[in-house]
């Protein structure tokens, strides 16, 4: 199965088509700078541009640089304060007319490591640290995510 994987970051928005079984990129990665200010409307315009770039009409898996609970942005992170309490998955779905699956960027990076990478079949605790515009973390115990750890916010 293929999905458009997208990473919304504090300085750039990146996307590529991904094989969900292997985690391999099927397309070249495309990057557009995160708009300043990174308001919901401005970011949604870049997300739409990404979807159009790939001529994509199916679901999008999207990582987001802050705490996300059930698709809702809890903190604004490195983005505009306007993001706080936005139901991000529905916002992008309405703006782009495709389903969106949204989660914290570091949690998703960790999920990739647990599923396909260095953490595969590891028992006990596995901690994944991401460093970009901000610092993120994904913590797993026996392969199960402990969501929204956000040690970069301590």
Predicted feature residues:
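Glycine/GP-enriched mid-protein hinge/lid loop-to-helix segment characteristic of carbohydrate kinases
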Residues: 2, 16-20, 27, 38-41, ...
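Generic N-terminal amphipathic, Lys/Arg-enriched alpha-helix
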Residues: 6, 21-33
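Conserved Rossmann-like nucleotide-cofactor binding loop
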Residues: 11
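Residue-level signal for inorganic ion chemistry
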Residues: 15, 32, 62
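Residue-level structural signal for beta-strand termini and adjacent loop
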Residues: 18, 30-32, 74, 79, ...
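Glycine-rich phosphate-binding loop and adjoining helix at the ATP-binding site
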Residues: 28, 37-48, 52, 58-60, ...
């Amino acid at each position: 199965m293929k999905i458009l994987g997208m990473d919304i970051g504090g300085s750039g928005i990146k996307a590529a088509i991904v094989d969900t079984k292997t985690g391999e990129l099927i397309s070249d990665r495309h990057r557009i700078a995160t708009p300043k200010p990174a308001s919901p409307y401005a970011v949604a315009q870049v997300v739409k541009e990404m979807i159009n770039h790939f001529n994509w009409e199916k679901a999008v898996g999207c990582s987001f640089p802050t705490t996300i609970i059930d698709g809702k942005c809890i903190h604004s992170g490195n983005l505009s304060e306007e993001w706080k309490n936005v139901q991000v998955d529905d916002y992008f779905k309405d703006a782009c007319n495709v389903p969106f699956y949204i989660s914290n960027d570091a949690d998703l990076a960790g999920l990739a490591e647990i599923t396909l990478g260095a953490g595969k079949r590891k028992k006990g605790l596995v901690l994944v640290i991401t460093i970009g515009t901000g610092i993120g973390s994904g913590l797993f115990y026996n392969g199960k995510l402990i969501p929204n750890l956000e040690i970069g916010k301590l």
